[in-house]
């Protein structure tokens, strides 16, 4: 290291008077010292103040320029040297060198800038101000078609530099996207897919950029899907495939790219992986099976890509996915159920699947997961059943297949996601199905659980769905027995609270259910309606200008129904409802105006 001190002293003198011969020798000594002990040599270089002199040596004409850039690249491998490089004013001359025609100068300059930018806000900022990114992208564009090893090496360095420049920095990534880096990199990948290092750089760059929403449109306008699938088919190593997966997952969130990936044959690749890995317990294989099946489900989230794979229920992909449901592999059961839930996003598909026995498969799957079951599988299978129950023609078929009995086995679940889907499935099944609604509504165990979940303040979804199912049981059954069961279980107060929901649809469902209670079974419910302050709430809803027309209408229908109770009617009189109702006679909505006239007559006659 004494040698190094001498070299640094000598370098100071020769750098000042630019003695080319001895300068080259000093630079060679420095490179040698850096190769032996980079960190220690870098510290000495920093302490010597030589960095400031390097700025003057970085000139396009000088023969030693590439070596100086090489030294900067080496010292910038150390985190503690990056800010000193910026402070020494090296960025601007380095960026100027990007205009050089000399390939070695370009290579070392790209390395130096890339290393200075690595994890360094100051480095990136300086390169940004000097306009380095655009010059590098222009180089990549012009070099793209060249396949000689030197050009490929240079492109690899430039890709690495752009990656270090923009990594985890949204604004710099957005800048690269606006400079058109994406089409350039996609083209690069297509031409140089045989070059492992360059391919890897492109994939890492895509992985970074694909997270940005603004990148998706640019990606969609290239043939990225085709290139990635082509590359994927060639890969045998787990790590390489994983790198491609990391790009595919964020890209596949875009519907246009989903379709492109399906058309490029990605699904066939994924199905093949599933087949290869399904029986393996090796950690890598289990991880790859999960990634492949998750990605498969993601592709089905796009309407067009989903329909393309469904192929009227005759598609080979759809058939393969069906075979996952009875499998013994939890990951495949989960992916299969989620895939069915996605296929069940339109009525035609739902009807076809129910007619072809999917319900029985899902019920069998749920039966396997009742005791200490897998929560994610329960959730996915219930999601699928809920979606399948939406078309009117499916409801009776699913009810006679015994879906409600299977679903009710999960009433004891303490997992909010499962509770939420269970409630949604039952609500869909009883829609306009009076007999089923009555049967469920008389099930005291179910109603008690609903009342309990109506108080699940920590889980708004479960709370909302419980309220909606309580209301639906009354609305679809119109049964006195159902109302009695709900009164006995303490459900009335929740329906009254539901009438104050911020969602009009829920308010309306509550008011219709309450009107049926008042019309069919007012006596037993009277006390609960009073203590829940129903009359005061109705007054507020009618007086509030923001209430939707249907809310005003159903509130007045309910007021009329409540007149059958002496105590509730007294509350109505005490609150001067006439004033509020008479104002509504001139309401712009005809139904509201008519109901206001009727209600006013009833109030006048009764008083």
Curated annotation (Swiss-Prot):
GO cellular component: cytosol; endoplasmic reticulum; extracellular space; mitochondrion; nucleus
SUPFAM superfamilies noted in UniProt: ARM repeat
Keywords: Acetylation, Cytoplasm, Endoplasmic reticulum, Guanine-nucleotide releasing factor, Mitochondrion, Nucleus, Repeat
Prevents binding to prenylated RHOA: annotated segments: 122-170
N6-acetyllysine: residues carrying this PTM: 230
Pfam families the record matches: Arm (PF00514)
Transmembrane segments: none
Subunit annotation: Interacts with RABL3. Interacts with RHOT1.
Protein known as: Rap1 GTPase-GDP dissociation stimulator 1
